[in-house]
């Protein structure tokens, strides 16, 4: 087993600044300086993309402290069209946030340009815990899960 620590999750955006603004406004994330502007042979070699050039930022994930993992939002200067988000598409699917009030958090997402994917659901899990959750999207269609876990039913 390797010695590892979680570092970041990457989202490729159509407009990195607008997407970063959304995550700052809705979830209170903060940009971790410096802003990134990468291009050249090292980026091309590492990504396997000829002529790769990107800009963006890392945003501190909420509730994890100054040395915690980040959400990395980058925008390539050119690239293929995005695939539509779908809850059953193979690969990385969504990012989840624990929130104290799912309906209020969902409204904050909508107010900042996000959209509805599904309904708000409350269910009891196999281990007896209750969770209220829903899927929404950010303004670029990336799926976000909002969840509120209750104590175990006694």
Regions found by a protein language model. Name each.
Residues 1-3, 87-88:
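Short, flexible turn/loop "capping" segments at secondary-structure junctions
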Residues 2, 11, 33-34, 71, ...:
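Vicinal oxygen chelate
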Residues 6-8, 90-94:
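Eukaryotic phosphotyrosine signaling hubs
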Residues 12-67, 104, 127:
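Core segments of cupin and vicinal oxygen chelate
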Residues 58, 76-79:
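Amide-forming acyltransferase catalytic core, primarily the GNAT-like/NAT-type
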Residues 62, 74-76, 149:
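Generic beta-structure capping elements
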């Amino acid at each position: 087993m390797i010695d590892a620590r979680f570092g970041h999750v990457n989202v490729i955006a159509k407009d990195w600044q607008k997407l970063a603004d959304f995550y700052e406004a809705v979830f209170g994330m903060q940009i971790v300086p410096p802003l990134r502007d990468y291009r050249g042979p090292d980026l091309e070699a590492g990504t396997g993309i000829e002529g790769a050039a990107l800009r963006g930022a890392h945003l501190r994930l909420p509730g994890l402290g100054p040395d915690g993992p980040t959400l990395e939002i980058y925008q390539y200067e050119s690239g293929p069209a995005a695939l539509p988000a779908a809850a059953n598409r193979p690969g990385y699917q969504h990012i989840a946030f624990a929130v104290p009030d799912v309906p209020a958090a969902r409204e904050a997402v909508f107010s900042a340009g996000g959209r509805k994917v599904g309904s708000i659901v409350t269910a009891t899990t196999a281990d007896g815990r209750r969770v209220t959750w829903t899927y929404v999207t950010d303004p670029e269609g990336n799926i976000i899960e909002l969840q509120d876990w209750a104590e175990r039913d006694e």
